């Protein structure tokens, strides 16, 4: 997706692209007020009526844990093995935590959240201190987080990125962007 985005920006220098970091609910509100042409967030699989979502990037959630954690020797971690763990998360308004709670409940447990913070970097800092574990998109494992190890889950939990837009308000620039990102 990164290379496709770069190419789009290079090939369309007259298209003004503004990046505004907003939580999914805020992006949706901006889309509904037509103050935003498109939003990008994880797991936008069921947009409201009149909106379309297009998957841009396939991704999965991993478990992040302190290096010395008792599950660190596992090459893949069954979700059920997290039943008695303490979790550090972000509030549901900032992240996919409601979705992840439902996934955990489907295998028979409700995660015990010991801390909620607003930034993923703070979540991982707390994990490195041994405060708890977290479920986080695999893109975070590409960065160096001292004291934290990432393990795939035995059950794939999607963390796919989607672009969301109003079906009847597609601008020529958005058509070009969608075409570039779909390649």
Name what the model sees in each region:
Residues 16, 30, 34-35, 55, ...:
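Conserved functional loop/turn residues at catalytic and ligand-binding sites
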Residues 148-183:
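A late-sequence structural motif
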Residues 50-61, 65-87, 172-175:
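Flexible hinge/capping segments at coil-to-helix
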Residues 4-13, 97-110:
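Ligand-binding cleft/hinge of the Venus flytrap
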Residues 25, 32, 36, 40-50, ...:
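A ligand-binding cleft/hinge motif common to bilobed small-molecule-binding domains
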Residues 1-46, 116-117:
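Central regulatory/effector-binding core of bacterial HTH transcription factors
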Residues 42, 86-107, 171-175, 179:
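Secondary-structure junction motif
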Residues 52-62, 134-139, 146-160:
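Short beta-strand->loop
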């Amino acid at each position: 997706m990164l290379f496709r985005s770069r190419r789009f920006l290079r090939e369309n220098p007259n298209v003004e692209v503004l990046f505004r970091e907003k939580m999914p609910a805020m992006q949706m509100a901006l889309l509904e007020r037509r103050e935003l042409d498109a939003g990008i967030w994880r797991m936008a699989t069921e947009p409201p009526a009149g909106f379309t979502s297009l998957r841009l990037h396939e991704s999965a959630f991993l478990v992040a844990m302190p290096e010395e954690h008792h599950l660190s020797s596992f090459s893949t971690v069954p979700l059920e093995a997290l039943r008695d763990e303490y979790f550090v998360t972000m509030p549901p308004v900032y992240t996919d935590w409601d979705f992840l709670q439902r996934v955990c409940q489907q295998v028979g447990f409700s995660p015990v959240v010991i801390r909620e913070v607003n930034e993923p970097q703070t979540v991982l800092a707390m994990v490195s201190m041994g405060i708890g574990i977290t479920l986080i998109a695999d893109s975070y494992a590409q960065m160096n987080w001292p004291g934290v190890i990432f393990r795939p889950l035995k059950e794939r939990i999607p963390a796919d990125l989607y672009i969301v837009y109003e079906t009847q308000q597609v601008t020529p620039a958005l058509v070009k962007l969608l075409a570039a990102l779909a390649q």
